[in-house]
Amino acid sequence: MERVLDFVGEYNLNKSIYNEFADKINYILNTDADRIIFDFHECKWFHASLTSVLGGMISICNKNNKNVILDIANGSAVADFFNRAGLFSEHFNYKPKEKKNA
């Protein structure tokens, strides 16, 4: 069974965003789904400091035997950010562009 967690809007550093992440983590811990899709299609901005929180969420999923997919629109600002930073590519729903200077 799979469940989708939506990431909608702008993810800046503020209390409401951290509360949203806490709610998502609680949901992950309490669902019996074995596949969790993090849907970033409606995400317009994702602060770099939140990548550690996202990584923690992925780690929690892995430790609870839940497969994670990052559903990100190829070419979106969020996908480009994660790709440039080399983050989470093993979880992308598409193959990230190869780095030209690597």
Regions found by a protein language model. Give the residues of each.
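Bergerat-fold GHKL ATPase/HATPase_c domain
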Residues: 1-35, 42-55, 59-102
